[in-house]
Amino acid sequence: MLRLAAAGARAIVDMSYARHFLDFQGSAIPRTMQKLVVTRLSPNFHEAVTLRRDCPVPLPGDGDLLVRNRFVGINASDINYSAGRYDPSLKPPFDIGFEGIGEVVALGLSASARYTVGQAVAYMAPGSFAEYTVVPASIAIPMPSVKPEYLTMLVSGTTAYLSLEELGELSEGKKVLVTAAAGGTGQFAVQLSKIAKCHVIGTCSSDEKAAFLKSIGCDRPINYRTEPVETVLKQEYPEGVDVVYESVGGAMFDLAVDALATKGRLIVIGFISGYQSPTGLSPIKAGVLPTKLLKKSASLRGFFLNHYFSKYQAAMERLLELYARGDLVCEVDLGHLAPDGRFIGLESVFQAVDYMYTGKNTGKLVVELPHPVSSKL
C-alpha cells in the first residue's frame, strides 16, 4: 500500500523497511529543496555558483543517511573547488560545500544498524551547501548534539591536528609560528601547539584578534597592521622558529622561510592570498628557496587533508575528547559583525565567502540553515 504524507511531502512506499525512510520525529520531508551548484568554473564565487531553489530532495541508498543540514562550514578552498582546481575532470554543474552538521531524517536499511532518525551527525563530503545531503553512513560522525562548535573540527581542526602531528615534530619548548592564527584552522594550530608545551607566536590583523589569541594561550600575538612581523621575529626570536604553520602564502611565506631556525620545518597547509587570482597562486621568491633551506638544513612540507584520511577518525576522536574536557576552544564566527549581519540561509553563503576574504573573521566561519531540530544546542 502507498502511504501519503502531508500535502507537498514525499510519498513513502509502506513496505517492511518503510520505517527506515520516514521522518517521524520532525516535519515531513519535502519534494524539493534549495542547494548551491557550481554552474561555471571560476574562483569568483558569485560568478561560479548558483542558488537553485527547486532541486529534488535526494533519496538515501541502502548504506546512506539523508541529513538535514543545520550548519555548514565556509573554507578558503571553496573558491578553489568552484574553479575546478582539485579535480579537472569535474565539469559543471556540480555540488559544492565540504562539511556540514545536522540531523538524520531518513536512512537506508543497512545504515539503520548504526544510526537512527533524529540522530545528530557531522560529515566531511562534497555537497554540504544544500538543505539536505545524502551522506554514506561509513563517513558520518555521530555527534552529541547539533552544535556549530563540532563543525569547526571537521576540516579546520583535523588539518591542524594531523599536519602538526605528522609533520611538525612538536616537543616541549619548541617555538611555533602560526600565520592567520585567529582564523578557522589557525586557532587550532595555536592551541594544539600549546598542548604540546610549545611557545607560540601568532600573526593576526587586529587588536581584537590579538586579544582572542591571548585568550587561547598564544604567547606572542602579532598584529601585523601595527607591528612589522619581520621586525618582531628578528628582534625577539633571533635564533628563529622551529615550526611554521603557514596558510597565507606570498610575502608571508617568504617571511616565514627567513624566520626558520636551523633544522626548522615550514608546513604549508594553504596560500589564501593567491586563491582569488586566475592561477590560484601567490608569487614567492622561489629562486632563492633551495639555498635558504640548504643553509639551515630546514625543510618545506606540504599538507593536504585528503592524503591523511586513514588517520582522520582518530584525529576527530582526539579533538572531540579535548573539547569535551574543556581543553579546546572552538571559536565560531556566524557573521554577527559582518556588514549584512548573521549568516542565515544558503543565500548568505555568498556573503560569508566574501567576508572570509576580507580577513575580518575570528574563528571558523559558519552559516546556519534554520530548520526545526530536536537536538538541543
From Swiss-Prot:
Record-annotated membrane-spanning stretches: none
Tagged with keyword Transcription: no
Catalyses which reaction(s): 13,14-dihydro-15-oxo-prostaglandin E2 + NADP(+) = 15-oxoprostaglandin E2 + NADPH + H(+); 13,14-dihydro-15-oxo-prostaglandin E1 + NADP(+) = 15-oxoprostaglandin E1 + NADPH + H(+); 13,14-dihydro-15-oxo-PGF2alpha + NADP(+) = 15-oxoprostaglandin F2alpha + NADPH + H(+); 13,14-dihydro-15-oxo-prostaglandin F1alpha + NADP(+) = 15-oxoprostaglandin F1alpha + NADPH + H(+)
Annotated keywords: Acetylation, Lipid metabolism, NADP, Oxidoreductase, Peroxisome, Phosphoprotein
Entry EC no(s): 1.3.1.48
Entry GO CC: mitochondrion; peroxisome
Pfam families registered for this protein in UniProt: ADH_N, ADH_zinc_N
Domain of life: Eukaryota
Principal location class: other
Tissue specificity: Widely expressed.
Modification N6-acetyllysine, positions: K35
Biological-process GO terms, alphabetical: lipid metabolic process; negative regulation of fat cell differentiation
UniProt modified residues of type Phosphoserine: S299
Cellular localization per UniProt: Peroxisome
MF-aspect GO terms: 15-oxoprostaglandin 13-oxidase [NAD(P)+] activity; zinc ion binding
Keyword Transmembrane helix: no
Inducing stimuli: Up-regulated by high fat diet. Down-regulated in white adipose tissue in ob/on mice.
Function as written in the Swiss-Prot or TrEMBL entry: Functions as 15-oxo-prostaglandin 13-reductase and acts on 15-keto-PGE1, 15-keto-PGE2, 15-keto-PGE1-alpha and 15-keto-PGE2-alpha with highest efficiency towards 15-keto-PGE2-alpha. Overexpression represses transcriptional activity of PPARG and inhibits adipocyte differentiation.
Protein family according to the UniProt entry: Belongs to the zinc-containing alcohol dehydrogenase family. Quinone oxidoreductase subfamily.
Protein name, entry field: Prostaglandin reductase-3
